[in-house]
């Protein structure tokens, strides 16, 4: 007999970015984000006052990690910059890389910075009442470009998993988002980014597993 999970409803507090009845949560403090930003001197200078500050936090509802179910939750992210570069999340690709994700902006002004395994770059706005679709196979990272907290709801297949190392191994994401000096933002190249070799690209597409099972 099939065991059914209980339906659930979770309330989001836009003031705090908290979600009721979450099954789990985690925080990333400023010190946890070392190495993400181009201006290492600016990061070091900010550590004295920012080191223990929670830059972003996630609360989630995770019924299980089986194929066919969903994980959803809320990310709350502070506004700020390191040098000229806006605050970002660590970013990831899904371990099951053919799994998509949806983000729904609830408060603030944000961007989703996306990168294909080959290095194509896309930027999608995630403002309040904006839905952002992250297709399968795209590495993605959230950016807060506003002066207020960024609050986003997310939802993805329960068996997706996350791979954070793919960004670090490439020297970061190919693009960075910085203040344009006119109240907006602009995209610049990351000179430390390294193109992935064919084997790494194939692995990110999950081709190795498919070939083994063929």
UniProtKB/Swiss-Prot annotation:
One of its GO terms (molecular function) is iron ion binding. One of its GO terms (biological process) is glycolytic process. Fe cation binds at residues 92, 94, 101, 140. Binds 1 Fe cation per subunit. It catalyses: alpha-D-glucose 6-phosphate = beta-D-fructose 6-phosphate. Gene3D superfamilies: Jelly Rolls. Homodimer. This is Putative glucose-6-phosphate isomerase 1. The gene is pgiA1.
